[in-house]
Amino acid sequence: QAVMNPENTFYSVKRIINEPTAASLAYGFDKK
């Protein structure tokens, strides 16, 4: 079910990369 749901997969990956990394990526994208 999780594999069939793109949103769940996205959240899983987000949890794997962790908050600091996600924040850095978001900050980088925001700066660009």
Curated annotation (Swiss-Prot):
Induction section of the entry: By heat shock. Acts as an early heat shock protein, induced within, and reaches a maximum by, 5 to 15 minutes of the start of heat stress. Levels decrease over time.
Superkingdom field: Bacteria
GO molecular function: ATP binding; ATP-dependent protein folding chaperone
Keywords: ATP-binding, Chaperone, Nucleotide-binding, Phosphoprotein, Stress response
Function: Acts as a chaperone.
Similarity comment: family membership: Belongs to the heat shock protein 70 family.
Other notes: On the 2D-gel the determined pI of this protein is: 4.7, its MW is: 70 kDa.
Name of the protein: Chaperone protein DnaK
Organism of origin: Anabaena sp. (strain L31)
